[in-house]
Amino acid sequence: MIFQRTVKEMVKTTGVGLHSGNKVTLTIKPAPVNTGIVLVRTDLTPSVAIAAKADQVRETTMCTALVNDEGVRISTIEHLFAALAGLGIDNATIEVDAPEIPIMDGSASPWVFLLQSVGIQEQSAAKKYLRIKRPVRVEDGDKWAELRPFKGFRVDFAIDFNHPEIARSQQHMVMDFSSSAFVRDISRARTFGFMRDIEYLRANNLALGGSMENAVVLDEYRVLNPDGLRYEDEFVKHKILDAFGDLYVAGHAIVGEFRAFKTGHALNNQLVRALLAEQDAWELVSFEKEEEVPVSFAVPAGAVLA
């Protein structure tokens, strides 16, 4: 049987909030089976917990943000959630003393390192997967995203940026997900932005924590970061990273194929909501025998299982 997983012990880190520019402290704690991922704002009195569910995503401008019915928000969850999804962590309590998750280096790599450093604990209950039974698709103009039946988890993703540096890179990628492939090929891809947009955002008191330390920055013609790119196709890989995090608010790892063109946080969330609303399009499954498990969901790379 494949079991649910949590972190083996508590781990804490600090970083900078992308929009506020302020120091943020974040703590990840083990959680019991069937808890899911729960975020807690510890800077409020009393503290406020928000379950990571698709219907709690109420802001998708430049990031994915959870917002409860009282308007309490936790922004920029997607890179941390990509790491949780990539390492197969089902249950965790995440405490944060600010309205946003720290941006770290703009990728999921610091979160992967943090989670692997404390290890992953197998738990006593069967892991549940969300298996796609029939296609579900959402569209917005020429942008679209869909989930289709597939034995495993495959991503077929394309972007289309009219920028000379991005146009020179590969803007389409197909990958069969595995934890090791995520860590090696996707997790280090950083968020990217254009200098003209950053200047506008800062003028409006946004992106105050953004810098070349946590993003790939481009002008009209080239990448401005002195060290260049981490992957030749870092742009499309980061969009895939974002999608991994955005899809994880479905509450379970997905068994299916995710196909998308020019999608972002908003359309990713619309897809998850559309899927969950069409209950005949999916089912929750567990795998009793090791040989039944799609190769995508083997034990995570670097996991310390007890």
Swiss-Prot record:
Known catalytic reactions: a UDP-3-O-[(3R)-3-hydroxyacyl]-N-acetyl-alpha-D-glucosamine + H2O = a UDP-3-O-[(3R)-3-hydroxyacyl]-alpha-D-glucosamine + acetate
Enzyme class: hydrolase
Positions of Zn(2+) binding: H79, H238, D242
GO biological process, one term: lipid A biosynthetic process
Annotated Gene Ontology cellular component terms: membrane
Entries under InterPro entries matching the protein: Ribosomal_Su5_D2-typ_SF, UDP-acyl_GlcNac_deAcase, UDP-acyl_GlcNac_deAcase_C, UDP-acyl_N-AcGlcN_deAcase_N
GO molecular function, one term: metal ion binding
EC identifiers of the protein: 3.5.1.108
Keyword Lipid biosynthesis on entry: yes
Entry keyword annotation includes Lipid biosynthesis: yes
Pathway this chain belongs to: Glycolipid biosynthesis; lipid IV(A) biosynthesis; lipid IV(A) from (3R)-3-hydroxytetradecanoyl-[acyl-carrier-protein] and UDP-N-acetyl-alpha-D-glucosamine: step 2/6
Cofactor (UniProt): Zn(2+)
Family membership: Belongs to the LpxC family.
NCBIfam families noted in UniProt: lpxC
Function statement: Catalyzes the hydrolysis of UDP-3-O-myristoyl-N-acetylglucosamine to form UDP-3-O-myristoylglucosamine and acetate, the committed step in lipid A biosynthesis.
Name of the featured protein: UDP-3-O-acyl-N-acetylglucosamine deacetylase
